[in-house]
Swiss-Prot record:
Record-given protein name: COMM domain-containing protein 8
InterPro entries listed in its UniProt record: COMM, COMMD4/6/7/8, COMMD8_HN
Function: Scaffold protein in the commander complex that is essential for endosomal recycling of transmembrane cargos; the commander complex is composed of the CCC subcomplex and the retriever subcomplex.
Biological process according to GO: signal transduction
Organism: Dictyostelium discoideum (Social amoeba)
GO molecular function per UniProt: NF-kappaB binding
Length: 205
């Protein structure tokens, strides 16, 4: 039996799959997967997520009821991030399990989640590679922006929030095609993007 183990992976955070400490708080939501009630339903949920990552149109209605709707939508976002991260870093099953264990996911779900990801690993990797290739062959050719003031209500008071609307013109190398992408950013989201750009700039120089 081979004693080979990938024990030399460097951890930049307490998780093998994360490189930015600020993202650790997102993984705090991973244990909420137990709301699904069984490892069988968990497997169905994870496979549905993987199908969606691979480009299929998936409905998650069968997992949702009036009581868990908010949690399920958050699980979709967090586990999509998790799957993309572990596959993007090409992590072995032991490290996927270790990350789930670190975030306090129950053992029965750790096995179910890791088995699902490993069984579809190459499908996910192929899809991520194709998406990366598409992004790499594209470039920003123009942009425009404007500020909008929107009103949001929480039934107690009404708050005016400034929102940045960023219109990007993306030029691809495929038939010189140009695409328009509209991004809506709150101040918090814009601050996060600018902070990320600062970090990238520091690494570059």
């Amino acid at each position: 039996m081979s004693s080979e183990k990938s024990t030399s992976i460097e951890k930049l955070t307490k998780y093998y799959s994360l490189q930015v400490v600020s993202q650790e708080r997102l993984y705090n939501f991973l244990p909420k997967i137990n709301i699904l009630g069984s490892d069988k339903v968990c497997c169905d949920f994870i496979h549905s997520l993987i199908d969606q990552i691979c480009g299929k149109i998936i409905s998650f209605d069968r997992f949702i009821n009036d009581e868990n709707q908010r949690i399920i939508y958050q699980l979709i976002r967090v586990y999509t991030l998790f799957i993309n991260k572990v596959v993007g870093k090409d992590l072995k099953k032991e490290f996927i399990c270790e990350d789930l264990k670190t975030s306090n996911v129950d053992n029965i779900y750790i096995t179910a989640i890791s088995d699902c990801i490993i069984s579809r690993f190459q499908d996910i990797k192929k899809e991520l590679t194709e998406k990366l290739s598409t992004i790499s062959s594209s470039s920003l050719s123009d942009f425009d922006w404007k500020m909008n003031a929107i009103l949001s209500s929480d039934r107690i008071n009404i708050v005016q929030e400034n929102v940045l609307l960023l219109n990007l013109t993306i030029e691809t190398n495929i038939n010189d095609k140009k695409e328009q992408v509209l991004i809506e950013l709150s101040k918090k989201e814009l601050d996060h993007i600018l902070e990320t750009f600062d970090q990238i700039n520091e690494v570059s120089f």
